[in-house]
Each structure stands twice: as structure tokens, then as C-alpha cells.
């Protein structure tokens, strides 16, 4: 809708996921003369605008979090519903993966991100369960992580409507992709 309504304006789309950019390019093809898509993190907005020779913008719209297509691709490791390697990177060129977060970050840091980024009330128990499991062998897949999370939760929590791993997966994904840091950086520039 935005691209269709621009008359003299230009829409700059920034995404760190190359597949999302390809999909956006197809979707926005009718307005290609008004749209520029850039493979970057939106936290690099100032650099992107400098490279395009743009000195200011009239508005900014941030589409945060994970998309349905990313969840649908099990091999990306975002979903707690399908078995896949622990990845969760929005941009596969980034180095930090969910595997590294889950298997190498200190227990207290895991507890912190589970609580702060996922609002997980069982964060201490889940972090402790992860710490115990990875002491035996690394947690390598999404469903292995789901099993560890389930093992740390009381039976009543497992009966709740929401999937028991939802908040933890959200927290780990946010940490892997530095999503809150990216928002903070783009707001500083905006």
C-alpha cells in the first residue's frame, strides 16, 4: 500500500534476510521505479541512506520479529514445532547462532535473556536445565531444546494454551539477532 501511494516519494526497504528481500522484490515489482531494497540491518539506516545519497526521510516503519515464511522453513531453526539445527539467524551470514547461545553462554546470561526478552517466568529453571543438559552433550536441534524446556516446567505450565517453548525461543531469537540492540540503534539515528 505504501509503495502504491507514493507519488514523488521513494520507499527504501531494508532487510537482513535475503529471502525476504527476494519476496519483497516480487511483491513490489509493479512499483519498482519507486522502491529500493537493501540487504542490511535496519540498525544501519544512516549508512544505507548515505550510500543512497538520501539526507532525510519522512517516515520509518519497522517490521520487527520473525515472519511466517521464516517459521515455515524448518531448517532455519526458528520453529519449536519442527526438528532442525539450532540456528535462528535472520541473516545466514551472521556468525552467532542459537546453538552457540544455548551451548556456550553462561547460565546466568541465559536466565537473563529468557526473562528479559521472553518474559519467561520459569527462566531460572529453564536456564538450569539447559546448563545440566549441555554438560552431558551439546543441545543441537530445536526439538532437543524443546525437550529441555519442557523438562524444566511444572506440569500445570505444560497444560497452558501457549506452547511451552514459545517464550524461550523468542528470547533466544532476539539474542541471536540482537533485535533490541538494532531497534535502539535505528531509533538513535531516526
Which positions does each model-derived feature cover?
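S-adenosyl-L-methionine-dependent methyltransferase catalytic core, i.e., the SAM/SAH-binding region
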Residues: 1-190
Amino acid at each position: 500500500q505504501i509503495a502504491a501511494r507514493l507519488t514523488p516519494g521513494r520507499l527504501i526497504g531494508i532487510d537482513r534476510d535475503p529471502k525476504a528481500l527476494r519476496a519483497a522484490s516480487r511483491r513490489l515489482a509493479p512499483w519498482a521505479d519507486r522502491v529500493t531494497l537493501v540487504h542490511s540491518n535496519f540498525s544501519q539506516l544512516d549508512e544505507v541512506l548515505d550510500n543512497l545519497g538520501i539526507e532525510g526521510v519522512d517516515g520509518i516503519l519497522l517490521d520487527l520479529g520473525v515472519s511466517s515464511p521464516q517459521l515455515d522453513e524448518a531448517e532455519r531453526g526458528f520453529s519449536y514445532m519442527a526438528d532442525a539445527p539450532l540456528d535462528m539467524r535472520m541473516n545466514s551470514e551472521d556468525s552467532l547462532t542459537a546453538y552457540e547461545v544455548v551451548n556456550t553462554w553462561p547460565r546466568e546470561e541465559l536466565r537473563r535473556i529468557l526473562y528479559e526478552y521472553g518474559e519467561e517466568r520459569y527462566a531460572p529453571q529453564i536456564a538450569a536445565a539447559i546448563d545440566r543438559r549441555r554438560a552431558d552433550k551439546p543441545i543441537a536441534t530445536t526439538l532437543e531444546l524443546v525437550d529441555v524446556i519442557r523438562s524444566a516446567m511444572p506440569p500445570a505450565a505444560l497444560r497452558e494454551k501457549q506452547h511451552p517453548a514459545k517464550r524461550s525461543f523468542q528470547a533466544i531469537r532476539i539474542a541471536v539477532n540482537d533485535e533490541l540492540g538494532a531497534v535502539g540503534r535505528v531509533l538513535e539515528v531516526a
